[in-house]
Amino acid sequence: LAEALAETRNSEHEVEFICARSECLPPVGVRTHIVGRPGGLKFIKMLWFLIRAEQVRKRGNYDLVISLGKTWNQDMMRVGGGPQKTFWELSEKAWPAGFSRWFKHLRRRLLPSNWLTRIIDNHQYRSGCRIICVSDAVRHWTQKAYPGIPVPEVIYNLPDLSRFTPPTPEQ
């Protein structure tokens, strides 16, 4: 997304990307802000990114902020997998009935990182930002989890078929 924006930008706007870490050089025309990622519990990593990304956003005085993750304030939000509570409802059936399902349910509700995810989700979905879902199914899950929000738009992610080849007989 950052690369596409950089290719189409005009001279009035710059493309900046706020991330916890970067594993490669940014595309031409994109400036990264690496906020770091402390070790330890997932809750600490998430909270660190939430706070640091918000600090960079405020200092940046951006015209448009697009969120691809767990950020506090944004103008547009891309939803890839749907809300956490919907994921829990759908995936709970994958666990066998009985103790293992009950224990998974309990662990999900006790983990501080899941509390933080729920808080961020609730804020993001109810913030009034424009919501873009990657499929009709994700839009349905989003509307079910957050009734009353504006209807999200759907923009499908198309695969890059040039990256895939049929398997060889040896494969």
PLM features per residue range, with description:
Residues 1-23, 60:
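N-terminal subdomain of nucleotide-sugar transferases
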Residues 11-16, 75, 130, 151:
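Residues at the starts of beta-strands that form the adenosine-phosphate
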Residues 21-44:
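Conserved nucleotide-sugar phosphate-binding/catalytic loop shared by glycosyltransferases and other
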Residues 39-65, 74, 114-123:
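An amphipathic, basic-hydrophobic alpha-helix
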Residues 55, 104-134, 150, 154:
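Membrane-proximal helix-turn-helix segments that form the acceptor-binding/catalytic region
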Residues 66-67, 73-104, 132, 153-154:
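Active-site proximal beta-strand in glycosyltransferases
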Residues 137, 158:
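Carbohydrate-associated surface elements
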Residues 165-171:
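A short helix/loop element that forms part of the nucleotide-sugar donor recognition site in Leloir-type
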